[in-house]
């Protein structure tokens, strides 16, 4: 009873529970299995549990399974609210040399050299209130411009316009990232057009 109460308290604060969270609190693992059998918990992945399917946060759960991934490109734009439509697939960036074994087909991977992998990493809350690692607005805009040929025209222009209108934008940071990713000229010319 006492232990179930402890687990319940954890669930009051977080919608996703990991086996490691429970073990850290000194709770024996079999309690989780018991709660699954009683229908109090749902096991959604190895070592990851939720209380209810309505709490199934695919972005947070996927990142708990693959802790090196950072949401990027369309996924980042969506999480930042620059596009409204939920992307058909998740897009993530990992560093070159990382072996993304067991990645589902519906995840699009981008590789980047290790020294640029951490540039612009930030944390955001999903619509479920869980925290995920995602590239900041400025890095996302630079990525968009770098891959312009492969990005849907409407998504490209909507994202840029919304970025310009956003109170969260940081143009100094944008130019700093643009320099690091060698897209400074492209960024400057686009900004001139958008600010006219």
Segments (PLM) and residue ranges:
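Charged, low-complexity surface patches
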Residues: 11, 24-25, 65
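A generic secondary-structure micro-motif detector
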Residues: 8, 21-22
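Nucleic-acid-binding surface
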Residues: 17-21, 36, 44, 48-196
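Short amphipathic alpha-helical interaction segments
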Residues: 24-37
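Short amphipathic alpha-helical interface segments
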Residues: 2-15
């Amino acid at each position: 009873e006492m232990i179930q109460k402890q687990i319940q308290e954890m669930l009051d604060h977080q919608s996703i529970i990991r086996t490691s969270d429970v073990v850290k609190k000194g709770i024996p693992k079999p309690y989780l299995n018991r709660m699954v059998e009683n229908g109090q918990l749902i096991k959604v992945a190895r070592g990851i549990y939720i209380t209810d399917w309505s709490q199934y946060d695919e972005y947070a759960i996927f990142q708990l399974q693959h802790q090196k991934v950072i949401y990027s490109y369309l996924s980042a734009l969506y999480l930042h609210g620059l596009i409204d439509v939920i992307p058909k697939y998740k897009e993530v960036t990992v560093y070159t040399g990382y072996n993304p074994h067991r990645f589902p087909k519906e995840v699009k991977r981008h590789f980047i050299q290790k020294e640029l992998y951490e540039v612009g990493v930030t944390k955001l809350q999903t619509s479920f209130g869980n925290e995920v690692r995602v590239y900041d607005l400025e890095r996302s805009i630079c990525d968009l411009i770098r891959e312009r040929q492969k990005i849907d025209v409407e998504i490209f222009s909507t994202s840029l316009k919304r970025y310009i209108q956003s109170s969260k934008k940081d143009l100094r940071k944008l130019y700093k990232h643009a320099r690091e990713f060698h897209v400074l000229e492209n960024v400057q010319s686009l900004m001139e057009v958008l600010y006219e």
